[in-house]
Structure formats: structure tokens, C-alpha cells
Amino acid sequence: MRTLVIEPLSKEAFAPFGDVIETDGSDHFMINNGSTMRFHRLATVETAQPEDQAIISIFRADALDMPLTIRMLERHPLGSQAFIPLLGNPFLIVVAPLGDEPVSGLVRAFVSNGRQGINYHRGVWHHPVLTIEKRDDFLVVDRSGTGNNCDEHFFKEDERLILAPHQ
């Protein structure tokens, strides 16, 4: 099994998979009579059907034991999905490029600094939310509508990966 190298999350490195939601280096302008800085259009919500709705939820995720064996990835073919950390804690992101199935050799891992969120583009393969050391809350923006919006792929045993953030 290959151990994933965990990369710092950056807009450039994550671009094939989606958007990094952060204020650093982002376009902004003043609003509210100069009392508020608006960081504009940090990500775009994607939905497949005109009747779909963009929705906002909170996910409360428990930390998983590390090192973690990556046995599966999922994707949302009908809409994007954004995770914005609410408690300021770093979290892990595991992704693979678009395709009919994820390719184990192309899987990448990133770590958010806790002030960065991410928006997976529609159809991007990813692991479910991964907190590092404790329960964490995330603001989630995704779509609600008809149709199956979650495909799962389970890797064969020899394709599985190891995620070890403390090594």
C-alpha cells in the first residue's frame, strides 16, 4: 500500500479538484459604507438541474484513527460540495481526478490550515470529511434535488492507500 504524501493546501495545487475558499490572495472590495471587506466569489455552487437548490448544512465529524487506510472515495455527479471549517482546526482532504472511477495512483492528499475551506467540483472523487484529532464542525454548501448524487468506489485491496498525518 502506498502512503500518501500530505501537501499543504493551495489554490494552485487544488485547482484540478475544485476551489480553495480563503481570504489570502483573494479578490475583495469594500461594502457597507467602508466598514466591511467582501471577499467575492470564492467558489461557485454547481447544480445539474434547474430545479436543484443550493443548500447550507452543518456537518459534525468525528476524528478517525490514524494512520487511516483509504478504502473508498465518493463523488457527487449532480453538484459541487463545499466544506468550510467553523472551529478553525486543520483538516485533511483526499481527492482523485474526474473519471468513471478513481485511479489509486492519482490520489492526492492535502491539509487545510483551518482557515481554508474547499469546494469540490461536480464529479470529483474525494474521501468523506476527515478531521485530524477531534470532533469538528463544517459549514457545507451542496445541492438538494432528485436523482442519485453520491457514487462510491471501493478500492481493491492492493489499490488501498495509507493516510498518516503524524509521520
Swiss-Prot record:
Lineage: Bacteria, Pseudomonadati, Pseudomonadota, Gammaproteobacteria, Pseudomonadales
A Pfam family this chain is assigned to: Ureidogly_lyase
Pathway terms, separated by semicolons: Nitrogen metabolism; (S)-allantoin degradation
PANTHER family, sorted: UREIDOGLYCOLATE HYDROLASE, UREIDOGLYCOLATE LYASE
Transmembrane feature ranges: none
Protein EC: 4.3.2.3
Broad class of enzyme this protein falls into: lyase
InterPro entries the record matches: RmlC_Cupin_sf, UAH_cupin, Ureidogly_lyase, Ureidogly_lyase_bac, Ureidoglycolate_lyase_dom_sf
GO molecular function: ureidoglycolate hydrolase activity; ureidoglycolate lyase activity
HAMAP family (UniProt xref): Ureidogly_lyase
Protein's organism: Pseudomonas fluorescens (strain ATCC BAA-477 / NRRL B-23932 / Pf-5)
Quaternary data: Homodimer.
Gene that encodes it: allA
Function: Catalyzes the catabolism of the allantoin degradation intermediate (S)-ureidoglycolate, generating urea and glyoxylate. Involved in the utilization of allantoin as nitrogen source.
Protein name: Ureidoglycolate lyase
